[in-house]
Design a protein with these regions (language model features):
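Hydrophobic alpha-helical bundles that form the membrane domains of multi-pass transporters
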Residues: 26, 33, 54, 94, ...
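Divalent metal-coordination and catalytic microenvironments
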Residues: 37, 53, 58, 81, ...
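Active-site environment of divalent metal-dependent phosphoester hydrolases
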Residues: 96-98, 124-127, 156-158, 192-194, ...
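Hydrophobic alpha-helical scaffolding
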Residues: 95, 122-126, 162-163, 223-226, ...
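Active-site core of metal-dependent hydrolases
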Residues: 193-258
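Di-metal (Zn2+ and/or Mg2+/Mn2+) metal-binding site signature of metallo-dependent hydrolases
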Residues: 82-104
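Divalent-metal coordination cores built from histidine and acidic residues
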Residues: 2-24, 28-29, 78-79, 83-84, ...
Length: 258
């Protein structure tokens, strides 16, 4: 196991994968095997009975019928009365809005099966600026099992008429995505006029962040509260905004997915 794989680089990820595949083949020893009564195959919508999960470091290397793994294992534990399912996750959350630090968030959600969260950080980003990722990673580096995938906020500052403790534009967003694999994209683009109106003073900054995200193959998350006209909804999608979690009215919940 590479000791610093809680926050990984592309270089470390390659080294981890190179060893992991050998463990999966039984050519290198595994650290742990967990035997369970059944395991949920999510994509097949099917329960598989009497399975074993083989672990190397912090990664799953092998899953198969009980006793099928052909390699050596340092330790085996058996829980025939339990079922195993992949960890639940939250694709959009503001831990910052709870006033909890990441380790306290982990203590609340991990016992309920939540193993990862996409932190949509714009509130705290307006305070700590480009050091935002450092804050979210600190608990993870200290050993917290909760994975936090960071999405720098598009609203830093919230509008062109405001100033804050941070400024994110093309350069900042590209550096976030280039330097850190835990950064997955751009957080909720919510200043809709700065997306569609070239005369809006926030237009260049917003599209700079979107461009940087596209260049680094990230995901651009949307925030389209109040968009009910089909022209606006179509324009929202045409801009490359891939999601919308902000639905306030029943007609929005029905019209937006259509």
């Amino acid at each position: 196991m590479i000791e610093d794989d809680l926050i990984i680089s592309a270089h470390d990820e390659v080294a981890i994968r190179q060893r992991l595949l050998l463990v999966a083949m039984g050519r290198e020893p595994a650290d742990l095997a967990i035997e369970v009564g059944r395991l949920l195959a999510v994509h097949a919508n099917h329960w598989m009975e009497n399975q074993e999960i083989v672990i190397s470091g912090r990664r799953i290397a092998y899953v198969g019928p009980l006793g099928s793994y052909r390699g050596t294992v340092a330790k085996r534990v058996s829980y025939p009365q339990l079922s195993a399912v992949p960890g639940f996750g939250e694709v959009h959350k503001h831990i910052e809005s709870t006033h909890l630090t990441p380790e306290y968030e982990a203590a609340l959600v991990l016992p309920r099966g939540n193993t990862w969260t996409c932190e949509a950080s714009h509130e705290f980003a307006n305070v700590d600026g480009t050091r935002n990722t450092e804050f979210w990673q600190k608990a993870r580096l200290a050993g917290s099992p909760l994975k936090i995938f960071i999405q720098p906020g598009s609203a830093v500052p919230p509008s062109a008429w405001e100033e804050s403790g941070g400024y994110y534009g093309y350069d900042e967003q590209k550096q976030f995505l280039r330097d850190d694999l835990s950064v997955t994209g751009l957080d909720e683009v919510m200043d809709w006029p700065s997306v569609w109106d070239p005369d809006n003073p926030g237009y260049a900054r917003m599209w700079g962040m979107i461009r940087a995200t596209f260049e680094m193959r990230g995901v651009v998350e949307g925030h389209g509260s109040g968009l009910v006209d089909p022209h606006d909804i179509s324009a929202f999608a045409a801009a490359g905004l891939s999601s919308d979690h902000e639905v306030w009215a029943l007609d929005e919940a029905w019209d937006d997915p259509k």
